[in-house]
Amino acid sequence: MPVGRREQIVDCRSVMGLGEGGGLAQRGTFAEALKNDVVVVAMSPGRRHITKPVCEITYGIREAGIQTSVLVLNAGSGIPHDAPRGALGSTFGIKPEEAEQINRHKLCVVHFGNVISHIVYKAGLLLKYVEIPTIIVCQAPVDMEDLAKYGIKTRDVMPLEPKTKGTVVDIVTGVIRGESCPQTKIDEVIRKIKLHLNLN
């Protein structure tokens, strides 16, 4: 797939796409890049969880010449079953093979939604199994202290009793689910990826 001035080969996809022409990646999709530099993780698509900003962010990262894989979680909507504030409906989770696919990479970029408590609970569960440095992209103004209070290891604030293997190294807020991602936010994600991959 030619993107920008460099060609990237992406092994895509494990299941058939959704929508007209199969343009929307379905849950369980893993599109693997030739080199395992960055993996972008999306919530499962559905009525409230749209993968649109993830597609635009991924395209921007690839255009910057960074080898990027994409994983759409099989159970990416809802909140974890052990979250303090339970909810009816779907339950967020990660399969062992999904964690293994993510851990083959150097850096994870994960897109969450707009409820701070949901972001914190999801990040907590994901990073129990994902061991690589992670950048969170979301709409809500969450910060490292919010994550550390729940036992999530972060670059800036370390919890007294860490519950996670992985560490949040950066956060990009203001990315609205289901809306086009502004170029300034895509640039911010790319800048932070380059910083943590030592590409500057």
Swiss-Prot record:
Record flagged with keyword Signal: no
Domain of life: Archaea
GO-annotated biological processes: methanogenesis
Record's keyword terms, sorted: Methanogenesis
Subunit structure as annotated in this protein's UniProt entry: MCR is composed of three subunits: alpha, beta, and gamma. The function of proteins C and D is not known.
Entry-linked NCBIfam families: met_CoM_red_C
Protein name (record): Methyl-coenzyme M reductase I operon protein C
Source organism of the structure: Methanocaldococcus jannaschii (strain ATCC 43067 / DSM 2661 / JAL-1 / JCM 10045 / NBRC 100440)
